Amino acid sequence: MAGASLNSPESKESVLDFTFSPEEEAFRQEVVAFLEKEGPQEWHKKKVSFFDMSGQENWIAVHRDMSRKLGARGWLSLHWPREYGGQGLSPFYRLILREELARYHCPGYHSLSVDFVAPAILLKGSEELKKRHLPGIASGEIMWCEGLSEPGHGSDMAAIETYAREDGDSYVVNGQKIWTTYAHFAEWMFLLARTDRQAQPNYRGLTFFLVDMCTPGITVNPIINMAGHHDFNEVFFDDVRIPKENIVDSVNRGWYVAMSVLDSERTSDLGYAIAGTLLNDIVEGAREMDMLDSGDKIRMAELVAECEVARLIHYHVTCMQAQGKDTSYEAAMCKLLGFESIQNVAEFGLKVFRNYGLLSDTSPFAPLYGRISSCYLRSFGHSMEAGTSEIDRDIIAQRGLGLPRLR
């Protein structure tokens, strides 16, 4: 971004300039041209969103195919260091790519792999782990899932009980993870497990492992969400043996590895772009069906403003990331505003289309191919990713406003 930085330090009021550079605008046009030629045309026609993806026929194959195409162009590693196969570009190139993928209703960008695992390995992994795992992520060939949440603990990641016992040159893992997105087809998992039951505070006893999902002892059971789609899973570990060489950083340092990359995950999915695209589709569909009244127009204007605020905050955070600044509470604002915008827009769609908005994609009378009800139902679960909205508010209160913890 041409002015994606603070103005001169001499200025009393530093102003952020969100004008994209000619090179960035050229990249945007390159992405648009690529999607028009290589993107899944049926998905574009049906306006399939991030939240409808798993409800589509052959969606895993489409997702993987697009991921490989993005990887072949080097677009999954735009901001990685050149020495590890990246292009060394600013985070704004990733933002531009994600914006256009959302507008085109295109899958293929697997943020768990690109924006959580890859940064963790780049920041904390050994050279061997970098050589072994980064090429598969950059090419789009290898998909990852996350082993964080557990039954009974919810958002309290420090209370993880899944236990890894040292045994020779390996650790033997027993326990359970839940709400594990895409575990049913991912090749690898990044797993946070307890290696010290006596550690105080308890978060100091966690270790970050990389786990081959084909390892004996792993069982994956599906969890069908409210929309009837299969994204989530529960994963059981029964004497699963993980080589010590698959530890990121070192034993009992897993909490710090996870915390170092959570900001990247919180800013990866561009909730404002998903919400804005859905809002445009709702307005277009409602106009065709002549279902917009004056009250709807007022609410629509409010939602446009809400999405715009979320977008500008996201740009601000991306500026900070480009400068290497800490973005802990700003990233929480990005995720909170983005995903709550999606919920608000989907709720608006239900109001605009009335009973028709409740219809699923199996009904020929469903507006937008049933996306309204699907997005509404899915948005609540996805708002919990990378921390619930309550955790986001707590982070903003503590780190942004200097207030005590809310809980």
Task: Report each predicted region and the residues it spans.
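C-terminal helix-coil-helix/basic helical segment that borders enzyme active sites and/or dimer interfaces
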Residues: 43-54, 287-294, 308-364
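Glycine-rich phosphate/cofactor-binding loops in nucleotide/flavin-utilizing enzymes
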Residues: 17, 28, 92, 96-100, ...
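Glycine-rich beta->alpha junctions and the first turn(s) of the following alpha-helix
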Residues: 3, 18-20, 218-312, 382
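A structural signal for short hydrophobic beta-strand segments in well-ordered beta-sheet cores
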Residues: 162-165
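A short core secondary-structure module
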Residues: 170, 174-221
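A short, Trp-centered hydrophobic/proline-enriched beta-strand micro-motif
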Residues: 140-148, 192
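Amphipathic, small/basic residue-rich leader segments at the start of a protein or domain
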Residues: 2-111, 132-139, 268, 296-301, ...
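Internal helix-loop-helix
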Residues: 64-141, 182-188, 307, 321-329, ...
